[in-house]
């Protein structure tokens, strides 16, 4: 029985990695070993940054809410505390959107929060 070296499957596996590395600079898109390292690193960064993105957006929303609430005479922490006491259940994403698109509406929400303090 002749020896089977698994050439087809090996080539398939290499081509899969090289396809993922398409568009990388230099040897990283041409040579299997360099491509493997680059793809592994890229996938690790992608995995990590999908989680970091959530933190970054939340901090962006908080910055926007803080800036808008300070225009209405409240700090961020007092604004959020006032909303919690008033039982207003609007999340930070929506509050940040209102702060940018509808400043008058945000001023009304700030008035509700201020009344509870």
From Swiss-Prot:
Q: What's in the GO CC field?
A: ribonucleoprotein complex; ribosome
One Pfam family assigned to this protein is Ribosomal_L20
An example Gene Ontology molecular-function term:
rRNA binding
Q: Name the keywords, alphabetized.
A: Ribonucleoprotein, Ribosomal protein, RNA-binding, rRNA-binding
Task: Write out the GO biological process terms.
Answer: ribosomal large subunit assembly; translation
Specify whether Ribonucleoprotein is a keyword of the entry.
Answer: yes
Matching entries from PANTHER family are given as:
39S RIBOSOMAL PROTEIN L20 (PTHR10986)
Family recorded in the similarity comment: Belongs to the bacterial ribosomal protein bL20 family.
**Its function?**
Binds directly to 23S ribosomal RNA and is necessary for the in vitro assembly process of the 50S ribosomal subunit. It is not involved in the protein synthesizing functions of that subunit.
* Protein name (database record): Large ribosomal subunit protein bL20
């Amino acid at each position: 029985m002749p020896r089977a070296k698994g050439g087809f499957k090996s080539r398939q596996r290499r081509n899969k990695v090289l396809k993922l590395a398409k568009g990388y600079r230099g040897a990283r898109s041409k040579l299997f070993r360099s491509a493997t390292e680059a793809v592994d690193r890229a996938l690790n960064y992608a995995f990590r940054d999908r989680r970091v993105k959530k933190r970054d957006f939340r901090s962006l929303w908080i910055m926007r809410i803080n800036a808008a609430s300070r225009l209405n005479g409240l700090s961020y922490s007092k604004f959020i505390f006032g909303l919690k006491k008033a039982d207003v259940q609007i999340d930070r994403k929506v509050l940040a959107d209102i702060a940018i698109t509808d400043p008058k509406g945000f001023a009304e929400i700030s008035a509700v929060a201020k009344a509870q303090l």
